[in-house]
Amino acid sequence: MKILVDENMPYARDLFSRLGEVIAVPGRPIPVAQLADADALMVRSVTKVNESLLAGKPIKFVGTATAGTDHVDEAWLKQAGIGFSAAPGCNAIAVVEYVFSSLLMLAERDGFSLHERTVGIVGVGNVGRRLQARLEALGIKTLLCDPPRADCGDEGDFRSLDELVQRADILTFHTPLFKDGPYKTLHLADEKLIRSLKPGAILINACRGAVVDNTALLTCLNEGQKLSVVLDVWEGEPELNVELLTKVDIGTPHIAGYTLEGKARGTTQVFEAYSKFIGHEQHVALDTLLPAPEFGRITLHGPLDQPTLKRLVHLVYDVRRDDAPLRKVAGIPGEFDKLRKNYLERREWSSLYVICDDASAASLLCKLGFNAVHHPAR
């Protein structure tokens, strides 16, 4: 059995070698010759999986180690009788922590408290729900918009996008990319929406680049609209609008979900799905794969305020470490993908063990996803 895996999927060689011969290949582009005698293909979001790639090939299963699936023609795979699995929610925690790192940086720079802001969350799936829970644990008001879930009767106080635009100080997008249909998200943030945002609002896109109309956004920024912008995703990736990058406050190369834990979850989820598909079901404990974190433990004295939270969050991950490298190489062919391929190891908040002498601080940190314990001061 021959299994092709994206060369940038961590732990893929070790895991899939339990099931057959593993060949690591670049994800963009996939070397077509390797598909001629392969049984399975494991990809990331950079690989377009469709009829033109796989027609006439012996591939029986495709796995994507990503939550999103807009790079995969699922309908054609089903028609062709090819098994498929994604990794829903694998990087949700990572994306939430990226948003927090960005907001805490902007709050410190601009001198505001997040408690004074209302956050509008567009898309309330694996990422949106987790973001809502962590924001509300901190006492930060949220507004939710998710028309498909609202129409299905899902639990939640869902509001219209227009209401979020009118009321939210921070608008953050966490939707799939739907190019048409009743729930179209292509250019969901169009020029009209962007111009309607509150003065001084923060716009965040960490889902799919084309959810925000990049041309319209640049037009508004060039005309002097007072707006802070965080973009992790871009229309036309791996190409991006270099002028737009110079205008945004934080710009990163589609790495919001790139924690070691998130990547490992993605790989293990598709590994487990494929092992079940071929009748040799196996399960993997995530902690058996992950290395020891850089910081073993730290001690926190007193209550948890916003400056302290910012220091803890940025101790684990400061978004500026990914903003600066992109600005240095923007516009140089191949560099966007190179930044992603050679991405520095990044951990999640759960990797940080925090000893608190304040019980309320320990409790709150646990709700936020840190590994915190209360040890009273002596």
UniProtKB/Swiss-Prot annotation:
A biological process (GO) of this protein is:
'de novo' pyridoxal 5'-phosphate biosynthetic process
Keyword S-adenosyl-L-methionine assigned to the entry: answer is: no
- Which CDD domains did the record assign? ErythrP_dh
Give TM segment ranges: none
User: Which residues make up the binding site for substrate?
Assistant: 45, 66, 258
> Member of which family?
Belongs to the D-isomer specific 2-hydroxyacid dehydrogenase family. PdxB subfamily.
User: In its UniProt entry, what is this protein called?
Assistant: Erythronate-4-phosphate dehydrogenase
What gene makes this protein? pdxB
